[in-house]
């Protein structure tokens, strides 16, 4: 039976509540665990799919819960589960599989609705050469993957590895927040406003890079649910 394990990486009293965005597009029964509070299932036998959420935490922190989640990710990949990580989820998959050097702190916040270039044909992101738009907000980034094991499948002008997929497993890391549309993204900017964070009005007034969203959440999640676990 298909069932999703949703790993909620939000922090106590967090501004970002992942499940509020993702639950409306989850088409299978699911269980949610607060991974950031050390809450993880004892095993993965009940799950075909795993979804790893974003977080306002840094994946570079050497916290016990981050180490435990990385171990779960390695187990899930070894068992052939369908695994998708968004934002922090994208980064923690990379760190779990490719080592600590796979993720680094950016020189500056990457935020907005960039043009996303699809580098390879992919079930979740579409055809190679196509362009889509989606919201990003991240201080850390995936900077290295093992090219023998994974393929970079999307980039932007500000981030060379905006998404990747394992070559022989249904495992994806995707930096953009496709679950957050333009209004959601602007609201989030207002909530976290501070040094280095652009004012939401700057996007509303911009004639050069106004907010643009492709609504990719729908094809993205349809493909996620259709993906099948790997059978050795």
Language model feature labels by segment:
Residues 1-81, 196-232:
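N-terminal beta1-alpha1 cap of cysteine-dependent amidohydrolase-like domains
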Residues 34, 57, 89, 140, ...:
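Catalytic metal-binding/acid-base residues of hydrolase active sites
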Residues 2-12, 118-232:
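Amide-donor transfer/coupling interface in amidating biosynthetic enzymes
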Residues 33-36, 106, 137, 155:
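Conserved beta-strand termini and adjacent loop/short-helix elements that scaffold enzyme active sites
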Residues 19-22, 47, 64-67, 97-101, ...:
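Short, glycine/charged-enriched secondary-structure capping and boundary segments
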Residues 16-17, 61-63, 93-96, 146, ...:
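Short glycine-/acidic-enriched loop or helix-start segments at secondary-structure transitions
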Residues 53-120:
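Cysteine-nucleophile active-site neighborhood
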